[in-house]
Amino acid sequence: MTPLERRSSISLALIFALRMLGLFLVLPVFALEARKYPGGDDPALVGLAMGIYGLTQAVLQLPLGMASDRFGRKRVIVLGPLVFAAGSLLAALADSLTGLLVGRALQGAGAVSAAVTALLADQTRDAVRTKAMALVGGSIGLMFAVALVAAPVLTAHIGLAGLFGLTCALALAGVAVVLWWVPAESAQHRNAPRGSVADVWRNPDLLRLNLGVFVLHTVQLSMWVAVPAMLVQAGLTKDHHWQVYLPAVVLSFVAMGGLFAMERRGRLRGALLGAIALVLLVQVGLGALAASGTTPTLWVLGPLMFLFFCGFNALEASQPSLVSRMAPAPVRGAALGSYNTLQSLGLFAGGALGGALVKWAGAPGLFATTAVLTALWLVLTWPLQPVGRNAGGGH
């Protein structure tokens, strides 16, 4: 990477990390802490308050991605953390579950993932873009692991309101990063001719990638409905689950070197298909374990979590990299907005699907469904065309 590419990658990854740390700190404790608020005895309302963030984010990803094409990436990126901070402050000051719900909805309105990834694509060459995207994905995975360890400790001292206050402070720190560290946009991007969002939806390979991120996050969130219970059955109490997740996440980052090697050899499509197959293998393994009737063991669950994070992190890096290469530069923000919209909808669908499947079909039925979804995804992605280094009018 050049110094400019390195600065852009690190600063934009930090923006993601600050935002996602705030989100992840709240998630492990939200359902329990929300019960202490008036209205918190309604499980449906608690679930809505948790999920409303993903819904408002999904609605606004595409419009804000298109706005970044028209008005500039950094303007939109500054706006996002400010809105997110306002939502966090509202949630911190809330005295009822309804107030928490409104705050969470406003948090989701700060949907800048598309603008951030579009700016990262603008400021990196195709040859190093997957590495840059992996830095963003890795920062998110690391924040997830940190939050699993820190959330229970922080909640015991500052409560849910304090966590939202901390989230607000992290978001404002993100604004400072945008203003004083993220490199300026190039005149080439600001003066580029504008394209049509229809160009995005007419591209079959972009549609495959959009479908892919929807399935990936549907499967991912569905998994977490059942996996924690399996870890408890294996003898690991809830406050020690990080002892499985943290090593799995960290070791999966080491395995990312293989992805970069395949990218350098022009085999990113092969890496993508291999990662999907890895996620499929994990779903089959978890399903077989759940259906066997035997007590799960950490010696089986630990390696399965490692394999899942290897596949998940590879897909989180390679898919947006491919979107940015395939999309014409004038509609790159719209393309990544569409991609992030489907990602958010996948998170929303995964929570709903996972809960319903565990209730009506148990863990074996859940993993059978996620395995079928992943297998269909692999089949539909197989015709994906190899991408040249200069596709999409890259940097």
What residue spans do the PLM features occupy?
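Conserved MFS/SLC helix-loop-helix module at the cytosolic interface between two early adjacent transmembrane helices
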Residues: 59-95
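Cytoplasmic helix-loop-helix junction between adjacent transmembrane helices
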Residues: 103-140
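Structural signature of the two symmetry-related core transmembrane helices
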Residues: 75-89, 168, 270-285, 371
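C-terminal transmembrane helical hairpin of 12-TM major facilitator-type secondary transporters
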Residues: 270-319
